[in-house]
Each structure stands twice: as structure tokens, then as C-alpha cells.
Amino acid sequence: MTNPTKPIPLNFDKPRRFMPPKHFADLSADERIDALKELGLPKFRANQIARHYYGRLEADPSTMTDLPAAAREKVKDALFPQLMQPVRAVQADDGETQKTLWKLHDGTLLESVLMRYPNRATLCISSQAGCGMACPFCATGQGGLDRNLSTGEIVDQVRAASATMQAEGGRLSNIVFMGMGEPLANYKRVVSAVRQITAPVPEGFGISQRNVTVSTVGLAPAIRKLADEDLSVTLAVSLHTPDDELRNTLVPTNNRWEVAEVLDAARYYADRSGRRVSIEYALIRDVNDQGWRADMLGKKLHKALGPLVHVNLIPLNPTPGSKWDASPMDRQKEFVQRVIAQGVTCTVRDTRGQEIAAACGQLAAEER
């Protein structure tokens, strides 16, 4: 990890690499019909192909046997470029957590994490290759931004994990945009992916909007824009401290949108969506874990969001080269109690995948 005393710059809009060829999942319903028409195929084939992709979780048209044999190769070449190739999959938590490293068409790397629980299966997906938000305690942020992912690259992470769960006799039930990247910095493609994830087959995978979480470091205008999409996904705001002075360092976007503006936007989202906002808070020993910060956090959240908020405390996950580590257990417990005392619910999140660098803030997509 880059030395936190030498901050890297924010990067919102200057990815260094090229986007992949257009994929079926990148196209609207009308665009799919037009693309098939150019191949000499009738429009009903678009629905047929969608049922294979979203319903049967097939990404190779050669397996779509209800398509004419002569059409399968055409469809594959025109609409199903290979977006991702698995490089490596590593497991933790007795096989219940699996981190997959993917190589994209241009050599860019990304990671996704599948977490199996007794009553659900959650996929943590990436929205960008790398991240431009430059948070000094996060391995992804310190690695910088390669490029935005296409809608197809985001959606295909979900299809691949859904196929894995289906092969095991299970079902992928939850999606969290908490992998690599700032989702709201790739706004249009992320919203398109959310709609495909949550639409019923054959328009999408049929995962409930209430089981989808979109995280952000606090891009206030984009939070308000998301609220106006009339979605009911959970918004998770990575706050990490309630005071602007420290947050300017921990979350550099705070120099553009301060805590009050972020919380105002979060309240707007809660009011429009009817959903409780999740506040993510990485507890860092002797940095942001003081009792007075817990009091301030609880007071600010209660004032801004009332009952429409829950705090997830995340003991800082170790990253290579970082000078920081997690708060001790007794301080975690005190922090929880002091936030709750201000009328805000608060829990310490169960951390999965730490030993394989699959936990929050650890994804670095390294080919090692």
C-alpha cells in the first residue's frame, strides 16, 4: 500500500484503458432487437436469448440449442464477447467465502467475493477496476483507478456467481456493491446493472431490490440522483468519522462534499426510498475510535436521519504497508454502546475473508 503520508490524487473521470466490446447486457431491449435484426434474426429471439442469459445463466450462445445452429455463431460473435476470464479463486471460512480474480479483455484485473451463509448467499461485486477515491486506509483506493467497468462486466459478475450457486443447488440472494471502485462514480452503468439484477426473468436475474446494497464514499449529488431513480435498494455511506477535519484525510472526497451535505443527501435518499440508510465506519485504533467521536456520530446521525439509519462498525482489515490497525475489542464495545446511547442502532459487522484479503478495503486485484 502507498504510504498514507503521501496521498494520491482523487480520480473521477480519467480511466487509462479502453472499454470492452458491446455485450448483450450492455444493450437496452430495443437495441437488442435492432442488433438481432442486423443479423437477420426476428425480434422474438431477443427474449429467447435473455431467458438463457438471465434465467439459465448461460453466457455461451453455442449452448442455446433452441436458436438455429447457423445463428448461434453470429449471436456469439456480435453480442457475447468474452468479458472476463477467471485467473484464480481462493477460499476461506471453511470454503464458505470465495474470492475470484478476473482478467478482463484488456488485461485489467478485478475481484469479486462470494459469501455463503446458512440462509442466503451474498456477492460483493466491483463497479470499477481499481478506485479513484484515494482513501488512505483502503488497498483498492491506494492502488488507483484503471477504468470504469461496463454494464456487461458488472452484470456478468452476478451471472457467474449465480451459476456457481445454481450448480451447488443454491441461489444467489444478495448483492452488495462493495467491491472495487466507487459505484456512484460509474453512475449510469451501475444503475443499469442494478435494474438488470433486480428485474424479473427474462429482463434480469430477479433478485429483490431490498437485497441489493449500493455503497458510496459520499458523492452527495449522485446520492440525490439515485434517490430520484425510484429504486428501493439499500444505500450504504462510508462515513468513517463524523468530523470534517479527520474525514478530509480519511475520505478525500470530503473536501468536496462535507459530512453535513452527505448526511442531507442520505436523508433525501431515505425519504424518497423509504429505506434505512447504512453508515459504514471502519474502526481504526487511536484514529477514529475515540468515545467523543462515537457520541458525535450518534448525535449527528440521529439529528439527520432519525430512525432511518443503522451503523455498521468494521474493525479495520489489515492491508500491506499500512501503518494503521483495528481498534481493540473493548474499544469496539464502548463505541457501540455510545452510539446506541444517542438513539442510533449500531452493530459490529461480521468480517469474512480477511485471511485471503477478501474483506472490506483489502481488494487489490493482484496477480500473485
UniProtKB/Swiss-Prot annotation:
Subcellular location field: Cytoplasm
Details of cofactor binding: Binds 1 [4Fe-4S] cluster. The cluster is coordinated with 3 cysteines and an exchangeable S-adenosyl-L-methionine.
GO molecular function: 4 iron, 4 sulfur cluster binding; metal ion binding; rRNA (adenine(2503)-C2-)-methyltransferase activity; rRNA binding; tRNA (adenine(37)-C2)-methyltransferase activity; tRNA binding
Catalytic activity: adenosine(2503) in 23S rRNA + 2 reduced [2Fe-2S]-[ferredoxin] + 2 S-adenosyl-L-methionine = 2-methyladenosine(2503) in 23S rRNA + 5'-deoxyadenosine + L-methionine + 2 oxidized [2Fe-2S]-[ferredoxin] + S-adenosyl-L-homocysteine; adenosine(37) in tRNA + 2 reduced [2Fe-2S]-[ferredoxin] + 2 S-adenosyl-L-methionine = 2-methyladenosine(37) in tRNA + 5'-deoxyadenosine + L-methionine + 2 oxidized [2Fe-2S]-[ferredoxin] + S-adenosyl-L-homocysteine
PROSITE patterns, A to Z: RADICAL_SAM (PS51918)
Primary site of residence: cytoplasm
InterPro entries linked: Aldolase_TIM, Methyltransferase_A, RNA_MTrfase_RlmN, rRNA_lsu_MTrfase_RlmN/Cfr, rSAM
SUPFAM superfamilies: Radical SAM enzymes
Keyword annotations of the record: 4Fe-4S, Cytoplasm, Disulfide bond, Iron, Iron-sulfur, Metal-binding, Methyltransferase, rRNA processing, S-adenosyl-L-methionine, Transferase, tRNA processing
Family membership noted in the UniProt record: Belongs to the radical SAM superfamily. RlmN family.
Name recorded for this polypeptide: Probable dual-specificity RNA methyltransferase RlmN
Organism name: Corynebacterium diphtheriae (strain ATCC 700971 / NCTC 13129 / Biotype gravis)
